[in-house]
C-alpha cells in the first residue's frame, strides 16, 4: 500500500467513537467506489488512553501523527478525570498534538446549509448563502507573549500583564495559508487587526500587504479593524470569503461566525502546520464540539461535524476536492430531506440518531456518485 495515504484516526472520548464510526462507513465506501486508498491507524487518546496507558497521549502516537498525511481527531474530555493534575487531564492530548506537530493555522469554516437557515441567529435574507473561512494564527499573539503574569505593586494593588507579540515570519506563514485557500475559493482575503492602536497590528497589516504584493497579486486583499469586522459579520456576513487574523481576534471572531450557522454540532475545523520536507503539511482535522459525555453511548450525537471534518481532510490534505464536494452535497441533501439529530431539531422535521444520520449521508452519496 505504498501509494496509499496514511491516516491516523484518534476517536477519543465521549461521543468521539460514535461519530467516528459513521466516518468509517464513508471511508469504506469511498475505498470501494472512489478509488480512495487509505492506510489507517487507530490509536487511543484522552481518557481512553489514560485508562489503558496512564497518559493522555503516548509519544508513539505523536510520532505516528508526524508520519501521517493527516490526523482525524474526535474529541477528548471526561469528568471522571477532573480531579487529577493538569498534565493527566484528557484534554492534554489535543494540546500536546498541536504543539508537537507545530500546528499554527486554524481553519474554521462557517457555511450555512439552506435547510438550517431558520436556526441561524440572523434573518434569512442576511445569512442566506453564507460560506466563509476564518484563518486564525494559533501560536503567537497575546496568549503566548512575554512578559506575562500577575504582580503585586508597592502600594499593595495587583497588576495583570499580557503581551501581544508577533514576528514577521509568524505573520507571513499564516498569510500564505489564507491566500492559498482563497485561490481555491472566491479569491478574496480580508486581513483583520487593530493597526490604529496596536503596533503588532500595524506590523501585521504591513507584512500581509507585502506577502500579497510579492506572491499573491492575483488575490483580492482588503484590510479591516477587528471591532468593525465583528460588526460586519453580523450586518453582512456574505461580504467575506477568507478572513485571516491573529490569535485573540481569531478566537473571538470564529466563535461569533459559528453561531451564524445555527449549530456547533455542524461545524468542522482544521489546524495546519508548516510545510514538511516531503512537501506536505502536518494537519489535524476535528469537529469543534466537545466530547459531550452527557449523551455519550445514547446514539443521539450529531455525526455531521465529524463527517464534514473528513471532507475538509480530503480537500486540504489529500487534494481530493471532488470527494469533499460529494460529502458536502450529500449532507446538504440529507438536511433538505428533513432529517435532524436532536441538536438541530425543529418543528416538522424527522428526528434520527447518530447511526441513521450517518447512513442517510452514505445513501445520498451513493445516489450522487
Swiss-Prot record:
Binding residues for Mg(2+):
227, 251, 255
| Record-linked InterPro entries | IsoCit/isopropylmalate_DH_CS, IsoPropMal-DH-like_dom, Isopropylmalate_DH
Name the pathway it acts in.
Amino-acid biosynthesis; L-leucine biosynthesis; L-leucine from 3-methyl-2-oxobutanoate: step 3/4
Cofactor, how bound (note) = Binds 1 Mg(2+) or Mn(2+) ion per subunit.
A Gene Ontology BP annotation from the UniProt entry: L-leucine biosynthetic process
EC number in record: 1.1.1.85
Task: Show the SMART domains listed in the entry.
Answer: Iso_dh (SM01329)
Under PROSITE patterns, the record lists: IDH_IMDH (PS00470)
Q: Which GO terms describe its cellular component?
A: cytosol
Q: Which cell locations does it reside in? A: Cytoplasm
What molecular functions are annotated in GO for this chain? 3-isopropylmalate dehydrogenase activity; magnesium ion binding; NAD binding
Q: Which UniProt keywords apply?
A: Amino-acid biosynthesis, Branched-chain amino acid biosynthesis, Cytoplasm, Leucine biosynthesis, Magnesium, Manganese, Metal-binding, NAD, Oxidoreductase
As its record notes, the protein acts as a catalyst of:
(2R,3S)-3-isopropylmalate + NAD(+) = 4-methyl-2-oxopentanoate + CO2 + NADH
Function field: Catalyzes the oxidation of 3-carboxy-2-hydroxy-4-methylpentanoate (3-isopropylmalate) to 3-carboxy-4-methyl-2-oxopentanoate. The product decarboxylates to 4-methyl-2 oxopentanoate.
In the record, the note on similarity to other proteins reads:
Belongs to the isocitrate and isopropylmalate dehydrogenases family. LeuB type 1 subfamily.
Q: How does this protein assemble?
A: Homodimer.
The protein depicted here goes by the name: 3-isopropylmalate dehydrogenase
Species per Swiss-Prot/TrEMBL record: Gluconobacter oxydans (strain 621H) (Gluconobacter suboxydans)
Q: Which gene encodes it?
A: leuB
